[in-house]
Amino acid sequence: MSAKIKSGDDIIVLTGKDKKKIGKVIKVIIRNAKKKVVVSGVNVCKRHTKPRAGSGGGIFNKELAIDVSNVAILDPKYKTPTKVGFKIIDGRKVRFAKVSGEVID
């Protein structure tokens, strides 16, 4: 089964406090039929950690997951939000941007 959003994709946030921010997908989480993505520089919170053996404590920034419905892939040609389609080229199933028709991978 092919996924519409994969790690390493450039995306834009459509809704929420980080609306219109652009980032790269770090991780895709699929749990209990809910899909979420972790995006670099988006939905950042501060985590306070205690010192442990081998590492000091402190306050660190951490990216939290966002629901897949709140993000869209950036079109490689026009840099606008786009939907993703699938087509078969030379016997391989590839993703393409519906706005420009460019192949994503």
UniProtKB/Swiss-Prot annotation:
GO CC annotations, alphabetized: ribonucleoprotein complex; ribosome
InterPro entries documented for this protein: Rib_uL2_dom2 (IPR014722), Ribosomal_uL24 (IPR003256), Ribosomal_uL24_CS (IPR005825), Translation_prot_SH3-like_sf (IPR008991)
GO biological process, one term: translation
Protein family according to the UniProt entry: Belongs to the universal ribosomal protein uL24 family.
Listed NCBIfam families: rplX_bact
Record note on quaternary structure: Part of the 50S ribosomal subunit.
Protein's recorded name: Large ribosomal subunit protein uL24
Lineage: Bacteria, Pseudomonadati, Pseudomonadota, Alphaproteobacteria, Rickettsiales
